Amino acid sequence: MKIIKRNGSEVDFDLNKIVVAVTKANAACEKQELTASQIQEIAEYVEFKTVKANRALSVEEIQDIVEDQIMAQGAFEVARRYVRYRYTRSLIRKANTTDNQILSLIECNNEEVKQENSNKNPTVNSVQRDYMAGEVSKDITKRILLPQDIVEAHEAGIIHFHDSDYFAQHMHNCDLVNLEDMLQNGTVISGTMIEKPHSFSTACNIATQIIAQVASSQYGGQSISLAHLAPFVQISREKIRASVQKEAEAFGATADQEQINKIAEERLRDEIRRGVQTIQYQVVTLLTTNGQAPFVTVFMYLGEAKNAQEKADLAMIIEETLRQRIQGVKNEKGVWITPAFPKLIYVLEEDNIHEGAPYWYLTELAAKCTAKRMVPDYISEKKMLEYKVDKNGEGHCYTCMGCRSFLTPYIDPKTNKPKYYGRFNQGVVTLNLVDIACSSGGDMDKFWKIFDERLELCYRALMCRHNRLKGTLSDAAPILWQYGALARLEKGEKIDKLLYGGYSTISLGYAGLYECTRYMTGKSHTDDEGGGKAFALSVMQHLNDACNKWKKQENIDFSIYGTPLESTTYKFAKCLQKRFGIIKGVTDKNYITNSYHVHVSEPIDAFTKLKFESEFQRLSPGGAISYVEVPNMQQNIPAVLQVMQYIYDNIMYAELNTKSDYCQCCGFDGEIKIVENADGKLIWQCPNCGNTDQDKMNVARRTCGYIGTQYWNQGRTQEIKDRVLHL
């Protein structure tokens, strides 16, 4: 049985320490109020509660239980002494708030840091440097930069102020990189002028350099479009044709144009293969200044091509990208595995969704890729054109920024044309809906009152995000603000104009709609007749109404965002259990449900789930993604295609979750299971050989839109274990 110390490290529970602490407090009293047997009884009760919690309790939680039990024994003077001791120790700890945290993460015994980010390896020096900087930033943020009530709400799990480890700096969240502008008009990387590339392979190489630079200048994800690389295929084609012509002439051969074109196309395909491979391998092997591979999404949308030739060339790039992802990348043992990045998004459209359509072959390839490697994810052009309508009444299809954060439609006042690439998100604050419900005690009037109070708190927290960016000079990140990734501002110019008028967005996240509804109505939000669904939709509308009010008030694009709780799901769950105890169906798990999702354990088929969630996705304009959990589908591609066609007709953005694991000890290639060890901790175990060494297995799971490969905290691991199949 483990407990979590204040520095995040995990240690064995020691009953004797409780006995010693209470005995000292008792001895300090003039009249000892507790007998040795009473002290032993207190310690044993704490041990019982710790076991019953079915998770590692924190030292603070254990001390709270000790206090309660001393009071229950009527030993009030002992309780006062114990509280005074805690307070004195707390003051000593606050004298330096970061030393223990930093030292524990350097020595790799900080359990919370180990499992905080499923794509960061905390044993690597570069990651540790990022975490060290993050601890300092979090400390400054808590003590100086944020109002105390926002800090307290964050620590209590009432809200989550995202990425406080980067808040000390003037950094934004995520964006759509304007790769087209940078490649066509040139850019500057690390003080070096980069001109328009003269081949597809060079364009791919430059793109990876841009990705790395952008990732090092922000804390969130980024997206690029393959359509911005497509024009360079024709440039390479013409170069290769000229080269083949020269070779023929040098040998005195007479080659007709058809032969030259055939040879050129073969060489061109080889260049496309090498270019795509450059992007894949550079992305997974690059380490940015925040200690991880860039969180990058590659967008594959035929509709972005400007002409027929460019569309055909884009199709070749998409085909090669899918083929290489199906193959995967080799791990250190030389075995092909599923890489986490880049994330791929494939747009379903009339030209590729029906059998017999011109690009149906790409959709079949995408289905095979999803069945084996969990990507691509799918955007329905049909539904997105319905959802994302600008002020002129025109619908648009575009990618999300990284995982799921979507921009709002925007017309550039300079050109009177829609603009998406070069825009960004300022940051996120997430509201814990479950806490609002539990705080209300089930009283509807009280619920809406507390809801409004919490929304006001979120508004002020979001304005802290906004104001932190306000006044930022373009010099803070030249690749972003001066050299085309997001803008081409002058040196020394402030970025303020990009923060207003809809150019960028700022996101109000939400989590736990299922548990909130369950507590307030006694029903799941999938329950149409019992009032669950109607209540859940009214909560969503209330969130949107708040954002619309703030938008008019501030001229800033506030939007609702279905938060991908990665490690925070565990934190929220622990905070809820601490504040409200174990409530069946509400706080009895070590996680809470992401955004509007159907609870992971609720039986529901794939099509019903997607149809149901589509209503809620539409009410999350700032971003959201739905998923269906499926078994190994590699031998049932027609079923995958059927789900994809359903996505096209019914929901804007969705993904299929499969399993893709490998045991390095025995070579097992299948699903590595989650089991409970002797301490009650969830661990990963090979079903073939029993291997439990995480360093000797490759596990890839969908964490929250992205694929995670570095394991997860106990809350998220339990959530993964509880997932039921939908197909």
Predicted features by range, described:
Residues P231, M300, I506-Y519, Q541, ...:
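Contiguous, well-ordered alpha-helical segments that form the cores/surfaces of helical PPI scaffolds
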Residues I272-V276, Q280, Y519, R716-D722:
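Metallocofactor- and cofactor-centric catalytic cores in central/energy metabolism, strongly enriched
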Residues L15-V19, G74-E77, K306-L314, T521-T526, ...:
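Short amphipathic alpha-helical segments with coiled-coil-like heptad repeat character
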Residues T88-I92, T98-G502, K523, E529-T692, ...:
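Conserved catalytic cores of very large enzyme subunits
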Residues S37, L57-E60, S504, G530, ...:
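Short, solvent-exposed positions on alpha-helices
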Residues M1-N109, K721-H726:
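Charged, amphipathic alpha-helical regulatory modules used
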